[in-house]
Swiss-Prot record:
Keyword Transferase: yes
Region (CTD-like region): 812-1036
Catalytic activity: L-seryl-[protein] + ATP = O-phospho-L-seryl-[protein] + ADP + H(+); L-threonyl-[protein] + ATP = O-phospho-L-threonyl-[protein] + ADP + H(+)
Bias kind Low complexity: ranges: 335-348
This protein's GO CC annotations: autophagosome; cytoplasm; cytoplasmic vesicle membrane; cytosol; phagophore assembly site; phagophore assembly site membrane
PROSITE patterns: PROTEIN_KINASE_ATP (PS00107), PROTEIN_KINASE_DOM (PS50011), PROTEIN_KINASE_ST (PS00108)
Domain commentary: The CTD-like region mediates membrane-binding and incorporation into large protein complexes.
Phylogenetic classification of the source organism: Eukaryota, Metazoa, Chordata, Craniata, Vertebrata
Protein name: Serine/threonine-protein kinase ULK2
Compositionally biased spans, kind Polar residues: 418-428, 504-521, 659-679
Subunit structure: Interacts with SYNGAP1. Component of a complex consisting of ATG13/KIAA0652, ULK1 and RB1CC1/FIP200. Interacts (via C-terminus) with ATG13/KIAA0652. Associates with the mammalian target of rapamycin complex 1 (mTORC1) through an interaction with RPTOR.
Membrane topology field: Peripheral membrane protein
Originating species: Homo sapiens (Human)
InterPro entries: Atg1-like, ATG1-like_MIT2, Atg1-like_tMIT, Kinase-like_dom_sf, Prot_kinase_dom, Protein_kinase_ATP_BS, Ser/Thr_kin_STPK_Ulk-1/2, Ser/Thr_kinase_AS
Length: 1036
């Protein structure tokens, strides 16, 4: 801590600095809570400003006012002069405007009152400030923390340019800030105290508009502007009040004689009037089709109104919600009670805000049993997607008004609701009634307190289409997943299966257990997790899901919207959903109303569905066909739904298509799934307790893996195929599961390292195609190794053969994706330097000469027994080694600098030790060691050369690595251009790229700006040529 009299400060607590001084924040040595600002002025600067400093000290001692910064002490040390002044904890007005942008008229009036009070003191003592600007107007909060505007104290500071200027006196010194200088000051004319009034006018204008009234690029341009324009008229916004506009026009007069004087300024009506009277908020008089963007700016006081405080708004809401209306109100009229209530509770800060009547609120609702008398048409209800249905309050008489962008969807919704209401009765024959319930559930699906009460069963309506009015996507009906009534049975492998679910028809309404069809093929059963809303069995449920699941519907009349009585329930698919577009792949496999409990035997799984897109068609085309083994139910001949797999045999295609209709319903937008190239079988383990984070694939295999209970027909075992979808790392074994209903949920966010079995994909997705491990797929024992015939083909390309195992693996996310920018920039720089040094090392190897070429040259020279030829050959070799040594030394220097940079960045925490960083640092270290080794070897070989060839010392000193690299790059480009001219275009692109990389690295190590500019121009020309080559190649 630095000591200044009774005060102390730390040089780290820098507040700001000016042209002559530096300001620190300090405190009293005994009273540590007394904060001060210590202004340090170096005596070296006092030669020209000593007089100004004396004036500032004298003026500050004389001025004692709450709106002027106080001077506590003056201390003179051998090298500096310290002024201990009052500390303002709110910063300056410039910072305040930077944060707020503009200020309201009420705030401007509060600030201007205090500025005027300070100017009154200055004017009474004949002092002109001459440097009034936002940076010299400080803000201080009384409670040492930011509060409302009324708690801000304005203080004028920095009287370094102030001087005594009594009446009838003029000054001619040019000082201050140009944008806030009066025109007479910047034009070097005589001026008086009215110059401060101009500065105050510019400050007020900036508070109102956000920028000074007159600006220019330089003081000279501003001076020329003032000289050319005899009359100046600032652009004042239209919504400005008349008093403030008059004040600004009076202060911003170019001619000081026409400018407002101090007495008129102190007694101006804008300062004398109170705050703008706030009007009570009024309800909206009518519905508006659109809101104008300038509606707020058209009101003079709308711009300056602040939002109501939270306690006031809570008080308004409590009183408005305490007395609900008895009858349906007319929204175009306002009752006297509501107007009086709002006027009582309206705050002065709620000007130009509109309070919507409480009967529109969606937070409170009451359920109304809809009978024959109170039933309305279904198009009067606004349907919202959610866990529960919106409840119609008894006072919502008006029809909902759709959003303009959703008119088509809304019309489609009305038609669907109308057709639904008139489509007939439910299973029991009770008429359908239109009850739509407002959502009372939390985002996780739990009921909120005060939830809607149950509706009688005879009035409950079954709405079979999932509707959404808040999305711009096309409407797509999607029924809920049908499940099987609660039963306990044994699967084909002997594993017990427990179920706690209700069977629902395609419209989502509960179906009595006695009338629920038992449509299963393999005896497997779908499960449903119990939800808290199951206690209301007669309530309609609307769920908003990312992708609509496939609904295995039941055959029979009354269970679907299709006009054909024998067709199963409708299957909705959204045409805008694309394969892979969902943010989570697990959303395709699992759709549950509540989060799935790990290890629970009642986890809900919706059948897997691939949307109808081009990508999905390609995926379905990869799935082969198998013949199903039928298993009749005990109570009828209708086939059971197969939750495990759908096996289609080529010779029995027609029979399989007929059976598939019982499993997959007709899609509204895509047609029959049986018309596709194949079916997607699904296998699921209902009793699995594996963790959700386990990286295991989803194996889809025929039932033969369970011991032949559902074995395929004869002759099909050898040709059976399966599809394996994997994300992340593969398992250790490629063996099929031991149970037909085993379904292992994959982790879709796995980006970790692979296990000992190796990763199928490192950085990009690819497809693994191979043959099954044995003639009977799934017959290999657990722990068996993967099939040796697996092979990889590029992801997205058609595999050469559909024989065997097909694996789709998504690309893993690189670690650097989630890193900070400093990490990625440093890593990019390290990679560039690594590639650059590798290119330099290639050039260095070329400089040394090829050993084969040297051998051929020796054999050639052996014919000519000439001593001169031997000397020239030896000299060229030694000279090449000199160039090699220089290049190796430069490469070692660059590699060492890169390694030091990486070490420093890792220590500072800016560079994370990721896999990519470790790899590049390892490569840099290896190259560095290699360069050091080569430097040692070349130095030993060149010792004799350096000792014998002293006359070449000057030439050797002129050899620089930068020059060698530049010449090599130029030669490389020239040779590539020459080859291009002769149509020898084999590797010219590679050479161009290498030359551009050399120049890029060279621009990073050069120091001379001219050299850097030349290298940059050369590199740009190479890049243009590369671009032209790529364009011509693409055209061909």
């Amino acid at each position: 801590m630095e000591v200044v009299g009774d005060f102390e400060y730390s040089k780290r607590d820098l507040v700001g600095h000016g042209a002559f001084a530096v300001v620190f924040r300090g405190r009293h040595r005994q009273k540590t809570d007394w904060e001060v600002a210590i202004k340090s002025i170096n005596k070296k600067n006092l030669s020209k400003s000593q007089i100004l400093l004396g004036k500032e000290i004298k003026i500050l001692k004389e001025l004692q006012h709450e709106n002027i910064v106080a001077l506590y002490d003056v201390q003179e040390l051998p090298n500096s002069v310290f002024l201990v002044m009052e500390y303002c904890n709110g910063g300056d007005l410039a910072d305040y405007l930077q944060a707020k942008g503009t200020l309201s008229e009420d705030t401007i009036r509060v600030f201007l009152h205090q500025i005027a009070a300070a100017m009154r003191i200055l004017h009474s003592k004949g002092i002109i400030h001459r440097d009034l600007k936002p940076q010299n107007i400080l803000l201080s909060y009384a409670n040492r923390r930011k509060s409302s505007v009324s708690g801000i104290r304005i203080k004028i500071a920095d009287f370094g340019f102030a001087r005594y200027l009594h009446s009838n006196m003029m000054a001619a010194t040019l000082c201050g800030s140009p944008m806030y200088m009066a025109p007479e000051v910047i034009m070097s004319q005589h001026y008086d105290a009215k110059a401060d009034l101009w500065s105050i006018g510019t400050v007020i204008y900036q508070c109102l508009v956000g920028k000074p009234p007159f600006q220019a690029n330089s003081p000279q341009d501003l001076r020329m502007f003032y000289e050319k324009n005899r009359s100046l008229m600032p652009s004042i916004p239209r919504e400005t009040s008349p008093y403030l506009a008059n004040l600004l026009l009076g202060l911003l007069q170019r001619n000081q004689k026409d400018r407002m004087d101090f007495e008129a300024f102190f007694s101006h009506p804008f300062l004398e009037q109170g705050p703008v009277k706030k009007s009570c908020p009024v309800p909206v008089p009518m519905y508006s089709g659109s809101v104008s963007g300038s509606s707020c700016g058209s009101s003079p006081s709308c711009r300056f109104a602040s939002p109501p405080s939270l306690p006031d708004m809570q008080h308004i809401q409590e009183e408005n919600l305490s007395s609900p209306p008895l009858g349906p109100p007319n929204y175009l009229q306002v009752s006297k009670d509501s107007a009086s209530t709002s006027s009582k509770n309206s705050s002065c800060d709620t000007d130009d805000f509109v309070l919507v009547p409480h009967n529109i609120s969606s937070d409170h609702s009451c359920d109304m049993p809809v009978g024959t008398a109170g039933r309305r048409a279904s198009n009067e209800f606004l349907v919202c997607g959610g866990q529960c249905q919106p409840t119609v309050s008894p006072h919502s008489e008006t029809a909902p008004i759709p959003v303009p962008t959703q008119i088509r969807n809304y019309q489609r919704i009305e038609q669907n609701l109308t057709s639904t209401a008139s489509s007939g009765t439910n299973v029991h024959g009770s008429p359908r009634s239109a009850v739509v319930r407002r959502s009372n559930t939390s985002p996780m699906g739990f009921l909120r307190p005060g939830s809607c009460s149950p509706v009688p069963a005879d009035t409950a309506q079954t709405v079979g289409r999932r509707l959404s009015t808040g999305s711009s996507r096309p409407y797509s009906p999607s029924p809920l997943v049908g499940t099987i009534p609660e039963q306990f049975s044994q699967c084909c492998c002997g594993h017990p299966q427990g179920h706690d679910s209700r069977s629902r028809n395609s419209s989502g309404s509960p179906v009595p257990q006695a009338q629920s069809p038992q449509s299963l093929l393999s005896g497997a059963r779908l499960q449903s997790a119990p939800t808290l809303t199951d206690i209301y069995q007669n309530k309609q449920k609307l769920r908003k899901q990312h992708s609509d699941p496939v609904c295995p519907s039941h055959t029979g009349a009354g269970y679907s919207y299709s006009p054909q009585p024998s067709r199963p329930g409708s299957l909705g698919t959204s045409p805008t959903k694309h394969l892979g577009s969902s943010p989570r792949s697990s959303d395709w496999f699992f759709k549950t109303p509540l989060p799935t409990i790990i290890g629970s035997p009642t986890k809900t799984t919706a059948p897997f569905k691939i949307p109808k897109t081009q990508a999905s068609s390609n995926l379905l085309a990869l799935v082969t066909r198998h013949g199903p083994a039928e298993e009749q139910s005990k109570d009828g001949n209708e086939p059971r739904e197969c939750a495990h797999c759908l096996l289609v045999q080529g010779s029995e295609r027609q029979r399989a298509e007929q059976q598939s209709k019982a499993v997959f319903g007709r899609s509204v937008s895509t047609g029959k799934l049986s018309d596709q190239q194949g079916k997607t079988p699904i296998c699921r383990h209902q009793g699995s307790t594996d963790s959700l984070n386990t990286e295991r694939p989803m194996d889809i295999a025929p039932a033969g893996a369970c011991g032949g209970v559902l074995a395929p027909p004869a002759g099909t075992a050898a040709s059976s195929k399966a599809v394996l979808f994997t994300v992340g790392s593969p398992p250790h074994s490629a063996a099929a599961p031991t149970c037909t209903h085993m379904f292992l949920r994959t982790r879709t966010t796995s980006v970790g390292p692979s296990n000992s079995g190796g990763s199928l994909c490192a950085m990009s997705g690819r497809v693994c195609v191979g043959s099954p491990p044995g003639p009977g797929f799934g017959s290999s024992p657990p722990g068996a190794e993967a099939a040796p015939s697996l092979r990889y083909v590029p992801y997205g390309a058609s595999p050469p053969s559909l024989e065997g195992l097909i694996t789709f693996e998504a690309p893993e996310l690189p670690e650097e994706t989630l890193m900070e920018r400093e990490h990625t920039d440093t890593l990019r720089h390290l990679n560039v330097m690594l590639m650059f040094t590798e290119c330099v090392l290639d050039l260095t190897a070329m400089r040394g000469g090829n050993p084969e070429l040297c051998t051929s040259a020796v054999s050639l020279y052996q014919i000519q027994e000439s001593v001169v030829v031997d000397q020239i050959s030896q000299l060229s070799k030694d000279w090449g080694r000199v160039e090699q040594l220089v290049l190796y030394m430069k490469a070692a220097q660059l590699l060492a600098a890169s390694l030091h940079l990486a070490k420093a960045q890792i220590k500072s925490g800016k560079l994370s030790p990721s896999t990519a960083v470790k790899q590049v640092v390892k490569n840099l270290n290896e190259r560095y060691k290699f360069c050091i080794t080569m430097c040692k070897k070349l130095t030993e070989k060149l010792n004799r050369f350096f000792s014998d060839k002293q006359r070449f010392i000057d030439e050797i000193n002129s050899v620089t690595a930068e020059k060698l690299i530049y010449n090599c790059a130029v030669e490389m480009v020239q040779s590539a251009a020459l080859d291009e001219m002769f149509q020898q275009t084999e590797d010219i692109v590679y050479r161009y790229h290498k030359a551009a990389l050399l120049l890029e690295g060279l621009s990073r190590i050069l120091q001379d700006p001219a050299d850097i500019e030349n290298v940059h121009k050369y590199k740009c020309s190479i890049e243009r040529r590369l671009s032209a080559l790529c364009h011509s190649t693409a055209t061909v």
